[in-house]
A protein has these predicted regions:
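Conserved kinase catalytic-core segment
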Residues: 133, 137-215
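Conserved ATP-binding subdomain of kinase catalytic cores across diverse folds
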Residues: 1-164, 178-180
C-alpha cells in the first residue's frame, strides 16, 4: 500500500531505480500470468470438468500457488490450483506431449513385466497442459515397498536409455507403491563432452546422471 503514495514511489525510483524496475516487472508478470491461467481455465472448464472431476463441479477456486518450477516466457511457471470441493490441479504453461508418449512406452514394457505403473492424467492444449495432482502417500506393507523399488528400477533403466537428468526427489511423487515421474521435460539431455571436464565424463555416462539414485 505504501507504493501507492507518490512520495514513496519517487523515493524508490530515485534511490533504487534498478530495484524499483525489478519490483515493477515482477508485479506485471504476476498479474499477466494470473490472468492467463484464469482465462485458460475458463476456456477449458468443460474439458477439465470431464477429465479430472468426473463431470462434477469442483467448486470455487480457493487459491493459486505460483512458482512450482522455474520461470519461463516472462514469468510463466508451473502453478497449483486449489478448489473448494475437488482438491487440486496442476497448470503447466507449455504443451507436454511426453505426458502422452511416456505412459505408452511404460504400457508396452508392462506387457512383459506385468508390474503396473501409475501416471498423472493430462489434458493437453496447444500451448499449455493441465495435469492431475497426485498426493504423496506411504506404503502400508513390505510387499508394497518391494514393488515400489521394482518399478523404480524399471524407471532407472528408461531414464538412462532416454538420457534423462534432474530426477531428484522434487520430480518424483511416492504415491503408495507407485513412483510417479512428474517432470518429463528432463528427458533427452545427451552427453556433450565439451560441457564437462574429465571428472564429469564418467558420471554423465552412468545411471547416476538421472539423479534417481542417492549419491
Amino acid at each position: 500500500s505504501s507504493l501507492q503514495e507518490e512520495n514513496v514511489r519517487m523515493y524508490f525510483t530515485t534511490s533504487f531505480p534498478i530495484l524499483f524496475e525489478y519490483i515493477k516487472n515482477e508485479i506485471e508478470q504476476w498479474v499477466n500470468h494470473s490472468l492467463l491461467i484464469i482465462n485458460r481455465y475458463l476456456d477449458d472448464y468443460g474439458k477439465i470438468q470431464q477429465k479430472f472431476f468426473n463431470g462434477t463441479n469442483p467448486g470455487k477456486l480457493n487459491s493459486i500457488v505460483f512458482g512450482l518450477g522455474d520461470k519461463h516466457n516472462q514469468g510463466e511457471s508451473v502453478t497449483l490450483l486449489h478448489f473448494e470441493k475437488a482438491g487440486k490441479l496442476i497448470y503447466v504453461p507449455r504443451k507436454r506431449n511426453l505426458h502422452i508418449h511416456f505412459p505408452k512406452i511404460c504400457d508396452w514394457l508392462d506387457g512383459t513385466l506385468n508390474i503396473g505403473f501409475k501416471h498423472p492424467e493430462c489434458l493437453i492444449s496447444e500451448n499449455h497442459t493441465w495435469v492431475e495432482f497426485i498426493e504423496n502417500t506411504t506404503c502400508i506393507n513390505s510387499d508394497q515397498i518391494h514393488r515400489y523399488y521394482e518399478r523404480t528400477g524399471v524407471y532407472l533403466t528408461l531414464l538412462y536409455a532416454m538420457d534423462a537428468t534432474d530426477f531428484h526427489y522434487e520430480n518424483i511423487i511416492a504415491s503408495g507403491e507407485f513412483p510417479v515421474l512428474i517432470d518429463l521435460e528432463s528427458f533427452f539431455h545427451p552427453f556433450m563432452p565439451f560441457e564437462f571436464n574429465e571428472n564429469h565424463i564418467g558420471l554423465s555416462n552412468s545411471v547416476l546422471k538421472s539423479g534417481l539414485l542417492p549419491a
